[in-house]
A protein has these predicted regions:
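Binding-site signature for planar aromatic cofactors or substrates
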Residues: 1-218
């Protein structure tokens, strides 16, 4: 493989032009509020999907798995996303609810890591979010056998068309297999790019007395 595919290592000039002096966030005491602020800033600067996050799970053999999904809600209870419970991630979550999340905002040169446990959100909450989706997306949730093998795209489209016909002229309810999960955070870490790889890291750990924070070496 050609080395030209990999970006060259930054030089002195690159670092000098990219240093950030905005470290006011280091004084934050509430990681959820800090996360919300960072996400709000990223929504302005990212090309798209600033709420995209990596969700890491493990299967029955302890083999890790990771994929990118969209964060759909955030408050002091946790981070919420939705998916098909019959998918690989859904099956893995039913086996082990220990989850790790990762956010990376290239435009801000920031990352956030979250570790915690996932629990299924209440049906009324999942129903409300499902109803807010575009009709086509709701139909797709019924038509897709997520993570299962399929012969070709024609097969997929035929099933989608059949599902559209099935719901023609009627509302599209949430399928029983389409669920939401809330990741209750036990650890949240914030990372801000620094010159010469000397980054700033701030970690929050949940204890019986609430959040405890501390700095980490880069």
């Amino acid at each position: 493989m050609s080395k030209s595919i990999i970006p060259s290592t930054p030089n002195e000039k690159d670092y000098a032009s990219s240093q950030s002096s905005d470290l006011g966030w280091i004084d934050s005491k509430d990681p959820v509020s800090l996360f919300s602020n960072w996400l709000s800033e990223a929504i302005v600067t990212e090309i798209n999907d600033a709420n995209a996050m990596s969700v890491a799970t493990v299967d029955k053999n302890g083999m890790p798995d990771v994929r990118v999904v969209l964060l759909k809600d955030i408050d002091h209870r946790g981070f919420v996303f939705y998916s098909n419970s019959e998918s690989n991630k859904g099956q893995q979550l039913s086996f082990s609810n220990k989850v790790a999340l990762g956010f990376h905002w290239k435009s801000k040169k920031r990352q956030v890591r979250v570790r915690g446990t996932a629990e299924v959100v209440a049906s009324i909450e999942a129903d409300a979010y499902f109803a807010s989706r575009a009709r086509g997306s709701r139909i797709s949730a019924w038509a897709s056998h997520q993570s299962r093998p399929v012969k070709d795209r024609e097969t997929m489209m035929n099933e989608l068309n059949e599902t559209e016909a099935r719901f023609e002229g009627t509302s599209v309810p949430r399928p029983n297999h389409w669920l939401g999960w809330r990741v209750k955070p036990e650890y949240i870490e914030f990372w801000q790019d620094g010159a010469y790889r000397f980054h700033d890291r701030l970690a929050f750990s949940m204890t019986s007395d609430g959040w405890v924070k501390g700095r980490l070496y880069p």
